[in-house]
Amino acid sequence: VLRRGAPLADRLTARMVELYGLPQPLRLDLQVKRYADDLTLLHPETLLTEQAQHAALDLRGSTVLVVDDVLYTGHSLLRVVEYLARKQPAAIRVACLVDRVTTRLPVHADVVGARLGIAPPDIIECHVPPYEPDFRIELVQPARPQ
């Protein structure tokens, strides 16, 4: 999932190829948007943008690994899983760097870097190269009224 999911997928892929000698997998980038980085709702329905070259992609029999930075309410992940399911893969697995443990929909991550049960207004910022200079996870607490 673009944006920060893509470099995470690259890191994960490189490690799997190195450790297990797997062939380089096909990469399918999906642009998904529902929330801004500050958790402001941008779109009432999750928007998914498909790259034209992937429209006719046949995933039958494949295992697909979806990689994203933060699992929040599950709306974006559900939209991605619905899209991929129409391409009939054998299995869809999900990896995320941070699970906020606040999903509202019947989706989950199979592989999670960190589960952080935090207050709803708090924000998880994932710093992922090349978008940021260093790799880290930060908890941002907006100013609360006194």
Residues covered by each model-derived region:
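PRPP-associated nucleotide enzymes
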Residues: 1-146
